[in-house]
Structure formats: structure tokens, C-alpha cells
UniProtKB/Swiss-Prot annotation:
Main location: cytoplasm
Cell compartments where the protein resides: Cytoplasm
Residues in J domain copies: 3-24
Gene designation: dnaJ
Family: Belongs to the DnaJ family.
Protein name per the record: Chaperone protein DnaJ
Cofactor(s), by name: Zn(2+)
Any one of the GO CC terms: cytoplasm
Function: Participates actively in the response to hyperosmotic and heat shock by preventing the aggregation of stress-denatured proteins and by disaggregating proteins, also in an autonomous, DnaK-independent fashion. Unfolded proteins bind initially to DnaJ; upon interaction with the DnaJ-bound protein, DnaK hydrolyzes its bound ATP, resulting in the formation of a stable complex. GrpE releases ADP from DnaK; ATP binding to DnaK triggers the release of the substrate protein, thus completing the reaction cycle.
GO terms under biological process: DNA replication
């Protein structure tokens, strides 16, 4: 999948920091 789908599945924005992504 592309990055947009990756972030969308996590429920975070493309501008989210790595820490926010890990928390998601």
C-alpha cells in the first residue's frame, strides 16, 4: 500500500510524528 493508505489505516495524519504513529 502507499503511504497515504498506511497513515489512513493508522488513523493519523501524514504530518504525524513517529511518536504519534507509535501511539496510534
Amino acid at each position: 500500500m502507499n503511504n497515504t493508505e498506511f497513515y489512513d489505516r493508522l488513523g493519523v495524519s501524514k504530518d504525524a510524528s513517529q511518536d504519534e504513529i507509535k501511539k496510534a
